[in-house]
Amino acid sequence: YLHWQGRCKGMTGVARITKLDFFIMKSQGISYLSLVAVILLFGLMGSSITVLCITGAWFIALMATNIFAIQEKNHLDRLYGSVCVSLNEVVLGRYTFVFLNYFTSMVVIIILYLGFVLCRKATFDVPDIMLGLGLSFLVFSTITGIQMPLFFKMGYTKAKLWSVIPFAVVMLLVVLPSFVSALSGILDFAQSHKELFAFACILTSCIIQFVSYHIAVIFYRKQR
């Protein structure tokens, strides 16, 4: 703890919380390697960049929020309380930590994808990559955007069951266009306007994260 505290001098409150989250999750780093294994497997099977990105977003949404479980299991509230930051900075720092997990995973996935493309001497389509990133960010934001306020309000143990709901919601949204013909036009639009659809996904994701953050702050303030 003293080692970590010394390394965080001069940082902003948000950066301190983000750094502390990474410090605590360092022991879980090996579990993230399973994402690389999954992406390699899917890549060898010839999966598209969209499938790879969405798989990564799903995985990170599942793994990154484990910080709440570790904090609760190891009674680390006192450690977080010792950091001189505001409640808003605690929440924003946690959101930043989770987002950086997603961002890093997307960088790794794109590098692996480009590696597959080069090995096969194929060509890659930038709009396809943009569409994959846009959809993956929407999946990630929808899941974590619902989960995070619940964890801040109820704690990991009490919210664990409720945290499954966003995964079910995302699965429903993914399969719904296949069964509802009226929604199939969305898929057609996405394929014919990849850049525009990707931008719409990113914009929607940012709105979800913004609203989620403010709800989480309200919930966390009431808990304190």
Task: Go through each PLM region and give its residues.
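Short helix-to-coil transition segments within interhelical loops
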Residues: 82-87
